[in-house]
Amino acid sequence: MLEADANGERLPMPDLTEPVEDPGPQIDRADELREKWQTERGQVWEVGRHRLMCGDAREQVDIETLLLLERPALMMTDPPYGLNKRMAGGTWGLAYRHSDMDEWDYVVPQETLDNLQSYTSNAIIWGGNHYYMKPSRCWLIWKKPYLPTLSDVELAWTTFDKPSKCYENSRQPFDGHPTSKPLGLLVWCLTNYATGDIFDPFLGSGTTMVAAEQLGRICYGMEIEPKYVAVTLERMSGMGLEPKLAGR
C-alpha cells in the first residue's frame, strides 16, 4: 500500500507490528446489539482506556462529560453534511450519514464544527470541503475504490502546515455504514498526524476507536445514535476489551 504527496512522489505505507485484529462492524445486527448492550442517550462507556458517550456533539455539556478535563491531541472526524439522499438503485449518494436517523436530518452548523475544534490541538475533518473552513496548506485525499457512480476521492481539511497527501487502497467491501472510512485510512492518518489521544465527535460504527486501539492511543468517541454505540461496543469487545458503563 502506498501514499503519495502533492508532487506525486510515492512512499511506502507505515508498517504496523501485530495490531489487534478488527472483527469489523456488524451493522446488520445494529438493532439486536442495542438490545444486548442496552445503549441509551446520556450513557458513558469505558472501553478499556477509551471513552464512548451516546450523546450529542452539538451540546457542550455532552462534550465536557465525555472528555472530562482531557485535551486530546487530534480531532479526527467525519461529520454529517447531508442526509436521506439516495441514488438510483439504492446506492448511497455523495451526501449521506445515518439516513435512518430523523433527529440528524440536517447539516451540522458551522459554529458546531468550529466549537469542536477548540477541544483539541489539531484537526482532520473528512468532508471539510463541504464547510467554510479556514485556508489549509495540508489537505488529505482518499482515492476511493468504490462504485463508479460515487466521487473518485474524498477530501479532509486539516490544521497542519505540511504537504498534502493522498491515500490509496485496494477495493474493500461496503460495511453497511454510509460514511464508513476504511480502517487502513484512519490508521494512516493517526500514524502520520497524531502522537497522542484522539477525539471523534461523530464516531459512527467505531473505526476511529479501532484505529486508536491498534496504535496504542486513547480515543474519546461521541455518537448520537444508540444502536451505533452498540455496534462499536460489540466491535471493541471482539478485540478483547470489556466495555462497562462509567461509574459501575
Map each language-model feature to its residues.
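Class I S-adenosyl-L-methionine-dependent methyltransferase catalytic core
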Residues: 10-199, 203-248
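Amphipathic, charge-rich alpha-helical segments that serve as recognition/docking helices
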Residues: 1-9
